[in-house]
Structure formats: structure tokens, C-alpha cells
Amino acid sequence: MASIRELHEQLVKKERSAVEITQETLDHIQELEPKLHSFLHITAQQALEQARAVDAKIAAGEEIGLLAGIPIGVKDNMCTKGIPTTCASRILENFVPPYESTVTQKLLDAGAVVVGKTNLDEFAMGSSTENSAYQVTANPWDLSRVPGGSSGGSAAAVAAEECVVALGSDTGGSIRQPASFCGVVGLKPTYGLVSRYGLVAYASSLDQIGPFGKSVEDTAILLKAIAGYDPKDSTSLKVEIPDYVASLKPDLKARGKLRIGVIKETFGEGLDSVVEQAVTKAIEQLQRLGAEIHVISCPNFRYGVPSYYIIAPSEASANLARYDGVKYGWRAPEGDNLLSMYKRTRATGFGAEVKRRIMIGTYALSAGYYDAYYLKAQKVRTLIKQDFENAFKNVDVLVSPTAPTTAFKAGEKTADPISMYLNDLMTIPVNLAGLPGLSLPCGFDEQGLPIGLQLIGKVLREDQLLQVAYAYEQSTSWHLSQPKIS
């Protein structure tokens, strides 16, 4: 599939219509979905209506933006008016929101064509998209393997060209890890840069919506469209949004000296040797492009996973208390009384992983353990944030592997939650610190599975992050590789 800019030029020159592009995309989805299961809901009728509106604008001689007529996928934990939003959970089965999330409203205002809602781990809790109550998404590079998670549906859809770009959410790595596994670009913005209004909450102090694309430029275009202050989100930042696309230059030294820090704690035990080799070669390539390379230490990085798995479940236990079968969503057959109905609904409506995290969070917040667990985890979070602040005194951008391995087999880790949690070892600290993080392809293993390089930036320096990613991408050809889906 062509890039956003190529499709835009075809539309403006009237070489193709938005309806033609949309119909071709829907046909491609219909062909691949029996194998991939990237989408929970395909919105063909609405998509074609949106495409016709774009064609009418072009016919009337009106100018259209870069995203007008572009097929986009949206993770199914973002509210879409009149379209089911299930969070891949039985408890929200058949829930149709009466309002639009801020990010999807921005897409519609830009003329984008939403072709469907993508699969995820239930309530975004997982690293493999195996926790969905409805279906398991396959990795386009190897259908027996997972696409990562929790935004696995969005990553797989972009990799398989079922849409040009897609939206995901990232609480502990849920955009970057699937981007790594599926060989696409995925960006988690600075906390507060993109509105969370209409995003179904998992852990409110960590959740952030971000873009997936086949290229850095496509990712930058989508970020520009969704970023910005929103009075409906109390954590939204009142900042000026730069032109992320204009900042993309193939010359890494276009803005002067660039210092890149390699986080030494992300190399060593637990890291696959083939991943280490690919990331090391990527760092060497950045050096050849003119970057100064420094090895730096973030000593508290290793405590990211244990602190995250206290903070995130604690917030989830509060956020998910609203699902009781009364106001919306699925309700279990009524029991003897109201309390019985609550219990039956929650016991049968939530999946095993969601119930596990609710229990962990409830335990960590209980009166006798609050100081020992939750308060301590928040102190560790502060230490991790300080590690990053100290590192950024000496460097501009940090690098690490995105994930310790390439995509694993479906079912391989479902019986071992700890092994599954360690998939986000490299990504979680970035969320705890509220920083921007990006994953882009930097190689393949011997089985042809993609490997991701993680770039971490200073607060609100997505422009610099995208510039480094673009310079690396333009000097390599990893992003041009395409999975052969049989």
C-alpha cells in the first residue's frame, strides 16, 4: 500500500478516488481477516460514507488535508459514536458509545476513513493480544506467532496493509512492543500530549494514545493530527504542537550535534543475542550518521516491571469498579439480589488476566499493605524518573532494544504471567516517567521475524525523536520489507 503522501497526491490529481482506495482496503481486509483476526469490528458502511464525503470535497474544488481519504484502524478501547467499543471484553459486549473520543473526532474532522476497530488484550492488559475475549490476532510475519500487545490488532493491521496507519494505546509498552514484533513504527507520546477523553481507562497515570505507521513520516502525520490540548481531559498539556513532518530530515546533524545514550541496563541477561546484535548494528549506523554515542546508566531501570505491576493494577482496580452490569455492557442472569448480580457479572464478564490484575491492585491498596506496596512503588517510580532526568543532562536521545525477544509462539507464555510481563522490561520505565518513546524496525532474526529499536526522548521532544528515527530509517531498508501472508 502507498504512503499517506502518495495516496494524497493520487487523490488531489484525481488519479484515484477515496471510495476506490477505501473499497480496495475493505476487500484486502476481507481477504486477510480469516487468517489474521486484526479487527473486531469492520465499519464498511461508515467508511464508504466518509470516503464519499472526501470525494465530494475534491469534486467541489476544496482543499483536503493529508489524512483525508486515508484508511485508518482504531484500537477498540477508544469510544466511537454509533460503533461498538468492547475493549475485547465480554463485559462490554455490544456496548455502543453515545459519544466520540477526542482522537477519533479529530480523525473524522481531518477526513480520515475509519475502516474498523482493532483487536487488543482485554482492557489493554497483556503483551500478546491473546487475552481478547473474542479472538486471537496472528502476527503477519508468522501466523503461528503473536503480534505483541496490547495493541496487537493495530500493529498487525498496519504490517499487513489492512490500513495505512492505526491508533493504539500504550500503558507499559502496548504500542512499542507490538510495533517491534510486527516490523512497523509505533510511537508513545509524552503523557498529556494526546487527549485521553474517550479512551477506556486502564491505568490513568500511564495510559497514552499514539500512532502506528509503516514509515516514520506516516507516523508523524498521524501524531500531528491527534496531538493537542483538550479541555475534556484534565491531564492534557497546554503546549504548542510543532510540525512533526517538517522536522523530518535525512541528515542527522541538520540541527547540530546529537548525543545518543545507550542504556547499559537494557543489555545483558534476558536479551536474545540476535536482538542484541541487531540493536548494536543500529547504534553503529547512528554513529556513522554523525551521532555521538555515550553509554549511560539508569540503575533503577530494573525495578520498572515490579513497580509497574503494583501501580497499574492498583489504578485498574479503581477504574474497572464501574463495570457492574447495571448501566451499560453485559449483565449476568440476575441472582438472588443486587450484590449477587454484581458478583456474577464481574466473575463471568472479566477474563482471567483482568481479574488477576484487579486482585493484585485491590491487595496493594488494602489498608495493611498500602505503604509496603503502592507507596513504595510510587517512590521507585520517582527514582526511575530521576534516572532519566540525570541521563538527559548529558545526552539528547536514549536508545535500547524495544523488546528482549522477537515474536513468540501463540500459547507459549499464557501459563506463565511473569514470563509474559517481562516482555515489557524495556518499555515500562518510559511510561512511568511520562516520556515519549518510539520503536522502529532495525533488522530480522534468522526466522525472518522483525526486531525493533527503541528511541526515548525528552518530555515533548517528539520532533527530535522522529528526526532521529527518520534519519536512521532513510539510511536503511528494514521498513520496506513486507510480510508474505500465506
Swiss-Prot record:
The keyword Ribonucleoprotein does not apply. The keyword Transferase does not apply. It comes from the Bacteria. Gene3D superfamilies: Amidase signature (AS) domain. Keywords: ATP-binding, Ligase, Nucleotide-binding, Protein biosynthesis. It is an enzyme of class 6 (ligase). It catalyses: L-glutamyl-tRNA(Gln) + L-glutamine + ATP + H2O = L-glutaminyl-tRNA(Gln) + L-glutamate + ADP + phosphate + H(+). The active site is at 75 (charge relay system), 150 (charge relay system), 174 (acyl-ester intermediate). It holds the Pfam family Amidase. PROSITE patterns: AMIDASES. Its EC number is 6.3.5.7. One of its GO terms (molecular function) is glutaminyl-tRNA synthase (glutamine-hydrolyzing) activity. One of its GO terms (biological process) is translation. One of its GO terms (cellular component) is glutamyl-tRNA(Gln) amidotransferase complex. Belongs to the amidase family. GatA subfamily. HAMAP family: GatA. Heterotrimer of A, B and C subunits. Allows the formation of correctly charged Gln-tRNA(Gln) through the transamidation of misacylated Glu-tRNA(Gln) in organisms which lack glutaminyl-tRNA synthetase. The reaction takes place in the presence of glutamine and ATP through an activated gamma-phospho-Glu-tRNA(Gln). This is Glutamyl-tRNA(Gln) amidotransferase subunit A. It comes from Trichormus variabilis (strain ATCC 29413 / PCC 7937) (Anabaena variabilis). The gene is gatA.
